[in-house]
Amino acid sequence: MNASIISGGLVSAAIALAGTTALAGPGDSPVPSISAFASTRVLYTVPGVIKNNGIETAIICTSLDTVAATLAFEVFAPEGGGPLNDVSAGVGNGTVALPAGATETISTGTSVGLHEDATISALGNVKNGSARILSTSTRVLCTGLLVEKLGSTPATITTIKIFARRKQNGD
């Protein structure tokens, strides 16, 4: 009798757990709205996002479109889950206006040697996180950088890979 109670309890617990799903980060988190006038699209996924020990992550994106768009940089923790910043909250939290033909830089924080058009406010340390680059235009090219925060001529600056819609180059 005790075995059937325990086994019934385990089945109930398994059913309860099966009904809850955890977000896996940039792969399945809901895409937020970053504009009242156009739909938001996931353009790129960025692994290796760091905001720690004097290193910041920046994305530099250029519009190839003939109309203005909105651009956003959404950061995720190493363990996945929902985004660490709310890009739907507007400028100052990883979202910028992207005029036609313009280039904009969004960073996890300020750095002496790199110009940022916007930084993500109130973002804590991120060690080996990830990100999504979102826009209201699909005609946007981006690159990513890891940059030393304090150097006017950064001793550390390197590009990071950015993947179009979860695919690496050559896939």
Describe the role of every protein-language-model region.
Residues 23-171:
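Gly/Pro-rich, tryptophan- and cysteine-flecked surface segments typical
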Residues 19-21:
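N-terminal signal peptide c-region/cleavage motif recognized by signal peptidases
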Residues 1-10:
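Bacterial N-terminal signal peptides that target proteins for export
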Residues 12-17:
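Core hydrophobic alpha-helical transmembrane segments of single-pass membrane proteins
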